[in-house]
Amino acid sequence: MQGFFWKTWLVLAVCGTPASLAHRPLSYGEALELAVSVYNGKAGEASLYRLLEAVPQPEWDPSSEGSQQLNFTLKETACQVEEERSLEECGFQEDGVVLECTGYYFFGETPPVVVLSCVPVGGVEEEEEEEEEEQKAEAENDEEVEKEKGDEEKDQPKRVKRFKKFFKKVKKSVKKRLKKIFKKPMVIGVTIPF
């Protein structure tokens, strides 16, 4: 009789498990709130970001077991992360950073996974314009410096001149690469505990 009791409990537990493993339906609004919360919690930024705009997703299926995508824009607020204030209390910074974000929800995974990718608005175009302006400014500056140092360098050997040119190129290359490293898109992936 005891064996039958435990077998019954085991069958009930196995039958009840799939229902508890399925994710709870997530509306589009809840998915956006969760994405903003994940970004603020994992991005390592000093300021909190708030939803500025969301692209409507009419094909969003709250009970989907597959992957779903959402697109939205975040803007930097005046609140700091360590203040732990509600986002509704935080106003946007006048010159705050604006981020274009794409979120991917993978509900077929156990537990569900969200991956966010955020890029500063106008990042590539502005970066190219800044590089061109910097190159022009550096070229003008180099010409002025060359004119001033022209008399001094006449006395220097060719080897010293070559080293100076080489190190200028290295310095420019390092600056350029550092700018690219720090302007890469932020990608965050987390599991969602339901």
UniProtKB/Swiss-Prot annotation:
Keyword Secreted: yes
Amino acid composition bias (Basic and acidic residues), ranges on this chain: 146-156
Record-linked Gene3D superfamilies: 3.10.450.10
GO cellular component: extracellular space; membrane; other organism cell membrane
Function: Potent antimicrobial peptide against Gram-negative (P.aeruginosa, K.pneumoniae, E.coli, A.baumannii). Shows moderate activities against Gram-positive bacteria (E.faecalis, S.aureus, S.pyogenes). Also shows antifungal activity against standard and clinical isolates of yeasts (MIC=10-40 uM) and dermatophytes (MIC=1-5 uM). Adopts an amphipathic alpha helical conformation, that may allow to partition into the target membrane. Shows high toxicity towards human fibroblasts (micromolar ranges). Shows low hemolytic activities on human erythrocytes.
Family: Belongs to the cathelicidin family.
Protein's name in the database: Crotalicidin
Species the sequence originates in: Crotalus durissus terrificus
